[in-house]
Amino acid sequence: MPLPIARSAIRRVSVHSSAFTLGCAGMRMISTPSKKKQDGGHTQPKAAASSLAHDATTAVRSLVPPPQPLRIVPPTPEEEAHMFESTVASVEQWLASPRFAQIHRPYTARDIVSKRGSMPVQPPASSLMADKLYALLERNATNRTAISTLGAIDPVQQSQMARQQDVVYVSGWACSSVLTTCDNEVGPDLADYPYTTVPNQVERLFKAQLHHDRKHWDERCHMSADQRATTPWVDYLRPIIADADTGHGGLSSVFRLAKLFAEQGAAAIHMEDQLHGGKKCGHQAGKVLVSTGEHINRLVTARFAWDILGSSNILIARTDSESAKLISTNIDVRDHEFIKGAYNLPPGTKSLSETLAEKEAQGVHGAELDNVEREWMDGVMLVTFNEAVANHNASNPSLLEEYDRRVEGGVSNAEARRIASEIFGEKGVPAWDWHAPRTKEGYFHFKGGLSAAIKRTKAFAPYSELLWLETKTPDLVRAQGFAAKIHEDFPGKWLVYNLSPSFNWSAHGFSDNDLRTFISDLGLSGFVLQLISLAGIHSTALITHELSKAFKEDGMLAYVKLIQRKERESGTDMLTHQRWSGAQYMDRVLQTVSSGTSSTSSMGADSTEHTF
């Protein structure tokens, strides 16, 4: 017996089932004869030749079935069980698709379906954009090339990038400095703004993309075939990659944030392994890491949020461990080999935190208290346990080789002590204390560097599509070495590189040709996504600085020389800013719904834009 459902006419249309052509009168479907169906001999429409239906030019769609009509009466227990099991089966098929072949999930399809509710899943538009991004990444990985892009801070920049850049990047640093949510308080990149800030910027840019796409489509619908053939197509639907910082809190915050990003239009997000509340820009000092396991939990949580939505958004795992010097906890044994402690601390020495607390109680504050901390740190030898073992047993190189072999890859500190005792005897175990030098906030000291970054990145690899090492210098050889190490265990894994404006590129010995080929050279090593995160910030600052300075001296001559003439020469559509904004599109909308509006048309004969 069919299930009782609301009466509604439902038509399922595949984007590959037919082709469309544009004409001045609008849209027209083309159908051509095809092979007859076996059941009755009726002819089926055949898709006309079209690049839109070609696998090489379109993204593979998410394997989410179309929604079913809602019920008007409750299901029986049997129907309810059938609904659940059939949905589980479809989700299992989705998870087993090639799209997720390299993604590990520590949960099941049943876990996903049980959290969805009874409303049929309809993935957000960002899922389509994610599919497009995935196809772009695949193509570049195959060709050993890279997607390179610039950070955009507003719809103007985004629209101008659309002609050359395949993707758009939204930086948390930029949002913190130019667009924050709620209180509009701008400041440095500490991720202390409301967690809706970057998603709101994404929504702003995504809606602008849709607007310019509609405007562009409408213009082409009113062109002749010859005009369309000579007018370049502009793809405004560029996947947006956004900065999710640390996830902005605990796992419930990560869950909400990932969901919000998907709903607001982000095709991909990146999350870094810094501590929320202690986060710094990747090129600043004072960074505090979370445990390896905590960041993995963040990645898993974001994926679970998207799976509930039925969305195939892309996750980028970033590590800041190359230059980090602190870690929030020693709970994860995978981090133990990089945690530093005080070696051969004199008996009776008070810990750093205890020393600082005593001095504060005595009224010592500010710079004087900083000096107390500096003196304490200068008076101890701060090393990892393995370094302490090597120093303590320097006279036994052969035994040290055995020790290094047995702790290779990392073991817990307790296990490392046991191994040292077994090899060197009790006296060979150094006096080493990782609690004594803990900071006032309780953080442990951490030995950052490439080894730590490689280990962490490999731990994050099964949970994300791309991996990002935040580097402290633009070093091509170092980046290539990092890529080689990652690809030993994860062949072909996609990598990200930040072409950061925080680097003084002119001070690193690059020739002009080195700079010209830097991106393509990195692309050969698997860095398929490369971005100048703050390009929008710097380009806006530069042109505004130059224009303001010249305008003060030369008045309108400065504007015409620096802006209007260059707009005309470069071919930017911003020269005619009314048309760029969509005024002509809106006129057509109003003329469609209300006749006799030509006299009030914003782009009528009196518009000054006709002088261009």
Regions found by a protein language model. Give the residues of each.
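N-terminal mitochondrial targeting presequence
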Residues: 1-73
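A broad, structure-centric signal for solvent-exposed, well-ordered loop/edge residues
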Residues: 8, 12, 107, 177, ...
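A short pocket-lining beta-strand/turn micro-motif at the edge of beta-sheets
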Residues: 30, 493, 528-531
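Extended, intrinsically disordered, low-complexity segments
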Residues: 70-73, 77-80, 84-87, 91, ...
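Alpha/beta enzyme core
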Residues: 105-106, 113-115, 131-140, 149-494, ...
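Short secondary-structure junctions
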Residues: 143-144
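Short beta-strand elements of ligand-binding domains
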Residues: 496-498
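Active-site beta-alpha connecting loops in nucleotide-dependent enzymes
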Residues: 508
